[in-house]
C-alpha cells in the first residue's frame, strides 16, 4: 500500500484551488485575448504605477526570461511601455500605456464581479482569512530561514 506524506496534499490543494479560480477568470481573459500572465502584469502595473523589471518579476511570480517575452508581446500590443532612466541604463521600468489602463478598467470590472460572486459563496470572513493565510504562506521562506 503506497504511503502518503501528511502534507503532500497542501501543494496539490493549492494548485487545484488556483485552477478552480481560473475557470472563473479565463473566459474574461480569453475574450480580451490576453493570458493569465499578461493579466497579472497589467493588474500589477495598474495598481502600482511604474515598477522596475525585477520587482514586477517577483510580484507576478514570473521568471525573468519568460517576463521578457511577455513584455515584448504587451509592448507590441501597445499596452505597456519600457522606460530606462538616464542615470542607470541597466535598470528597466515598466508602465501601462493609456490603452493598457483602458483594458485594465474594462477587464477589472468583470474580474471584480467574479470575485464578488466567489465571496458570496465563501463569505467575507473566509475570503479575508484565506487572503491572510496565503500572504503568510507566501512569506514562509523568510520565516524558515531567519
UniProtKB/Swiss-Prot annotation:
Signal peptide: none annotated. Induction: Repressed by the HTH-type transcriptional regulator MtrR. Negatively autoregulated. PANTHER family: 4-HYDROXYPHENYLACETATE CATABOLISM PROTEIN (PTHR33164:SF13), TRANSCRIPTIONAL REGULATOR, MARR FAMILY (PTHR33164). Residues 53-76 bind DNA. The gene is farR. Transmembrane segments: none annotated. Keywords: DNA-binding, Repressor, Transcription, Transcription regulation. InterPro entries: HpaR/FarR (IPR012712), HTH_MarR-typ (IPR000835), MarR/SlyA-like (IPR039422), Tscrpt_reg_MarR-type_CS (IPR023187), WH-like_DNA-bd_sf (IPR036388), WH_DNA-bd_sf (IPR036390). This is HTH-type transcriptional regulator FarR. It comes from the Bacteria. Repressor activity requires the presence of the Integration Host Factor (IHF), which binds to sequences located between FarR binding sites A and C. IHF binding to the promoter region stabilizes the binding of FarR to its binding sites A and C and as a consequence, enhances repression of the farAB operon. It comes from Neisseria gonorrhoeae. GO terms for biological process: negative regulation of DNA-templated transcription; response to stress. PROSITE patterns: HTH_MARR_1, HTH_MARR_2. Negatively controls expression of the farAB operon by binding directly to the farAB promoter region. Binds to three sites (sites A, B and C) within the DNA sequence upstream of farA. Also represses its own expression. Residues 7-139 form the HTH marR-type domain. GO terms for molecular function: DNA binding; DNA-binding transcription factor activity.
